[in-house]
Amino acid sequence: MEKIYVKIYELSGLEDKDNFSCYIKIYWQNKKYKSCILQKNPYKFNEIFLLPIDIKNNVKDEKNNILSIEVWSSGILNNNKIAYTFFELDHIRRERISSEKINLIDVVKKCTLQISVHIINNNQDILFCNIKDIFGNNKNDKEIHDAILKYGGNERHIIKELRKEKEIGQYNNIYFNDYVNVLNTDPSQNYIYNDMPKITPNNIYNNMNNDQTNHTYLKAPNSLYNNENTIYSSNVHYSTYMNNSPTYKNSNNMNHVTNMYASNDLHNSNHFKPHSNAYSTINYDNNNYIYPQNHTNIYNRASPGSDQTLYFSPCNQKKALLIGINYYGTKYELNGCTNDTLRMKDLLVTKYKFYDSSNNIVRLIDNEANPNYRPTRRNILSALMWLTRDNKPGDILFFLFSGHGSQEKDHNHIEKDGYNESILPSDFETEGVIIDDELHKYLIQPLNEGVKLIAVVDSCNSGSSIDLAYKYKLKSKKWKEDKNPFHVICDVTQFSGCKDKEVSYEVNTGQIAPGGSLVTAMVQILKNNMNTPSIITYEYLLHNIHAHVKQHSNQTVTFMSSQKFNMNRLFDFEHIIKNKNNQLGQIINKYIEKNKSKNKNKLKHELKNLFFF
């Protein structure tokens, strides 16, 4: 069936003083389509609409069918049409519109809308349109079609061919930045923990007949917990199992020795005690407070309810990775995930002073023209590497995933319910999912002490999707440690849309553009308290998110952390508390042989195939 493929890029041409909220309305064959609402200029929508063509095949019907695109302002009391344009269907067939700036017919204001409008029949046509939008008139249709036929729909290779480059280079109007530079870089070796568990591309674990698994052994210093100021150099005697372990230095000149030992044989492996492998440049006072070199602790007291030292760096960086996947054109299609990334980005920039720069905030959405910024499995893992690269004490990181989540069987026998939680990239049907062990490996394990990460995962089965050690029970107001926790050295918290065995829903009240239940609630609560940040504690935020979500669905918002802390701690992007875990790495208390209940086992498999959100 034919469809009109409409891509809305950016609204421009308005004056700086016209800083009102805007959205796009599209009218086609007695149906109305609406974009998300953007709150300030410039208005970069980057949204795609697929409009079915349902008419008789004659010229009269072609001319009588009008595609209308309107720009509206959003106000408290009413909405107003600002400008519009329209196209007859036969005009769309005759003259393709590829990423062109259209001067709209003004009603209130003069403005320009950058759009693409094409007729498509299949996914190959969409691929052609996306590539045509990138190259414009620099490549003719035949060159693009030939490249598509040559590489069988592999967009990355097609663009390489058309640009005659050895590596993916600069696209139209898109410049190289740190994220793009990471794309073809292998993960750096982790100097704090060994990889746990071993990750293979297809999530297949070998030699499982004897319940074998991988171990992670602690290589962080004892001196973090005993007031010693030890220097660990290349001349220090290694234990037997560390004979061949290299020493790495990070950006703060801290020496770390990598333990390369990891056994797949449970019967022959031993649990080693941590060795004195101290940070050579960290000093401790008599109260065991840490003062990293070149960083200043400017506070004379800790965050409310906390007895721990706070980190602050005068040159700290704030970075955010925002992933929203609507799975366009599939049976799993969602409506509000890309909206979630826009809302969260606006909140981070306006309230929490993140720089609105591609070197500080990266968005991966599936309607992005540049294939580097689409949420494929490869791009997501590369983006996680970008987010955590060169992190240092005082850095603040934020991670958002909005999309589908599922569960995969845990062949390592570590998960309490027997399943790994996972997120679904846009190409999960061909490239596979990303399980929680991988998210932990790429997102959590690379983080140094004194680094803060706040993660928000709005998807099904997301409760423990990044494998943090502690879960906060809102009803009892108590922390509970995971059965087999992985303790880390950084300061990490996670808000999840639901428990591991639940589904998470979208909210579409008609008052605002659709979005995930968790993100919609979180953004609304934080924006309502824009001028009173001192009252937003973790307890306050979690309680209000929970109440807001329960108004629309029966899912249970989950909160987890890398360490226990007083929930009266302020929710902000400034204070970083010292991690007090006295053990690091994977702690195996009990291997899970099987699920306790066949009914639970059956429920997990049923939930695995649910894709409500």
Swiss-Prot record:
Documented EC number(s): 3.4.22.-
Ranges annotated as spanning the membrane: none
Keywords, ordered alphabetically: Apoptosis, Hydrolase, Protease, Thiol protease, Zymogen
GO molecular function list: calcium-dependent cysteine-type endopeptidase activity; cysteine-type endopeptidase activity
Cross-referenced Pfam families: C2 (PF00168), Peptidase_C14 (PF00656)
Catalytic residues in the record: H404, C460
Function: Cysteine protease that cleaves specifically after arginine or lysine residues. May play a role in apoptosis.
Family indicated by similarity: Belongs to the peptidase C14B family.
Complexes and interactors: Monomer.
Record protein name field: Metacaspase-1
The organism of origin for this protein: Plasmodium falciparum (isolate 3D7)
Species classification: Eukaryota, Sar, Alveolata, Apicomplexa, Aconoidasida
